[in-house]
Amino acid sequence: MAINFSPKVGEILECNFGNYPVSQNGQFSTTYYDGRIPPEMIKNRLVVVLNGKINGNACIVVPLSTTRDHDKLNRGMHVEIASNVINDLQFFDQQIRWAKADLEQQVSRNRLNRARTYRGYLNQCLPHELVADIQRAVIKSINAISLIN
């Protein structure tokens, strides 16, 4: 169920990014512009909220992934989140994740919901230091590092 509140900076939510449209030959369509196109983010995944008050119905989020990209990690565009930082969830294993700051985007609150735990729903924010690392990684990914040096 979609959220009906303004999430806090650093809050962990689940986002349904949708999927790629498939053409008649079974391949992902790269010319259908009313949906996602590779390599854009897809599927249900955890996200970190960076701004929950864009307007009445939008948030800026950074998706979390269990796939490490050594190159982007070394370039400071991905931030490692240790396996014990995010509480145990029903549909997401407790494991190392990476905040993919190069995939930061604005999404509708209709795409966002609280992730399920075994006894309800997750209500958790990342530590401030980790959120600051993710924010710096977003700045690096948009090639604006000179603004903070």
Predicted features by range, described:
Residues 2-5, 73-149:
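C-terminal terminal-subdomain/extension
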Residues 20-31, 37-38:
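Short, Lys/Arg- and Gly-enriched loop/turn segments at beta-strand edges
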Residues 24, 56, 70-71, 108-111:
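Intrinsically disordered, low-complexity acidic/polar segments
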Residues 33-44, 49-87:
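Compact nucleic-acid interaction/catalytic patches
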